[in-house]
């Protein structure tokens, strides 16, 4: 059985597919850049656009398309010459836990994992539709891949209505019930440690380069109402940290929870184990992130 924490510690580049709803918020943009600026740890095979639906989109399909365009924009800011394949993902969520939603992204995930001579790490930071669809289309990829997903809240949290998970509950059920080795980065109760502020972002990034200026403006705009003492969790970077800086994540191996139809956790100690991240070391992770961004 693959010892994921030990594999992650190895100082070699990992083959990575990044699945992102890049236009949903502002944290995906930081994460795409962080991955591209960490070539000693990350070899990006592809970036896939995930669906989302909130005030920044009119439908899951619109959210996916906006994310696709935002991915291209960020890749261009980091390195205009970068040759990273980018794929459109699902236009809707899974109808149930048995039927995939086929897309260019899901097909690319299947192909890239099957073609690889090494373990492929799928880092998913949005609704899990593309990855769940790939697993339904080709269950064999679970033997050659590891999934790192930022989704769900901490196991002790009073509810599990977390954005990424709650959008596609059948998709979450697919991945938690599958055989793919899984690392879960919970949101509330764990990622809430990874917080920053506009003054901190401006201090380290403002004026450094076009990418940094874009990230500063994104962060400022997210507090459009000018709320005092405002802070922002840059959630998604913690998922890429599993590949880039695993020393900043406290991981434990426990039985996988069951995802109920109401998105709650249920427990069966006989279930396959997975890796659960229970703590983020905020300061060294931000130090690494800011250093790489300002040197872009």
Language-model-detected regions and their locations in the chain:
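Active-site histidine-anchored catalytic micro-motif
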Residues: 2-65, 92-198, 281
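A general structural signal for well-ordered alpha-helical segments in protein cores
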Residues: 68-71, 106, 237
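Ligand-binding beta-strand-loop-alpha-helix segment within the catalytic cores
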Residues: 82-88
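Short glycine/proline- and acidic residue-enriched helix-loop micro-motifs
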Residues: 90-95, 222-226
């Amino acid at each position: 059985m693959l010892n994921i924490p030990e594999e992650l510690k190895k100082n070699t580049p990992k083959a990575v597919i990044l699945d992102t709803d890049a236009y949903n918020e502002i944290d995906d943009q930081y994460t795409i850049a962080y991955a591209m600026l960490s070539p000693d740890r990350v070899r990006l095979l592809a970036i896939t656009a995930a669906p989302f639906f909130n005030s920044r989109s009119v439908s899951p399909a619109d959210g996916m398309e906006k994310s696709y365009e935002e991915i291209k924009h960020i890749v261009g800011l980091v390195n205009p010459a970068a040759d990273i394949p980018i794929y459109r993902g699902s236009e809707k969520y899974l109808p149930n836990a048995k039927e995939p939603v086929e897309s260019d992204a899901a097909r690319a995930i299947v192909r890239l994992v099957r073609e690889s001579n090494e373990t492929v790490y799928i880092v998913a930071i949005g609704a899990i539709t593309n990855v769940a669809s790939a697993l339904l289309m080709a269950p064999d990829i679970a033997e050659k891949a590891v999934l790192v997903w930022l989704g769900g809240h901490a196991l002790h949290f009073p509810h599990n209505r977390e954005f990424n998970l709650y959008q596609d509950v059948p998709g979450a059920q697919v991945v938690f019930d599958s055989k793919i080795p899984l690392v879960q980065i919970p949101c509330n109760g764990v990622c809430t440690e990874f917080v920053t502020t506009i003054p901190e972002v401006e201090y380290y990034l403002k004026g450094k380069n076009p990418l940094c200026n874009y990230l500063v403006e994104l962060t400022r705009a997210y507090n459009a109402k000018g709320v005092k003492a405002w802070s922002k969790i840059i959630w998604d970077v913690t998922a890429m940290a599993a590949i880039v800086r695993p020393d900043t994540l406290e991981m434990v191996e426990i039985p996988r929870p069951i995802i109920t139809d109401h998105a709650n956790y249920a427990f069966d100690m006989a279930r396959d184990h997975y890796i659960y991240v229970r703590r983020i070391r905020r300061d060294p992770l931000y130090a690494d992130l800011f250093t790489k961004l300002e040197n872009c």
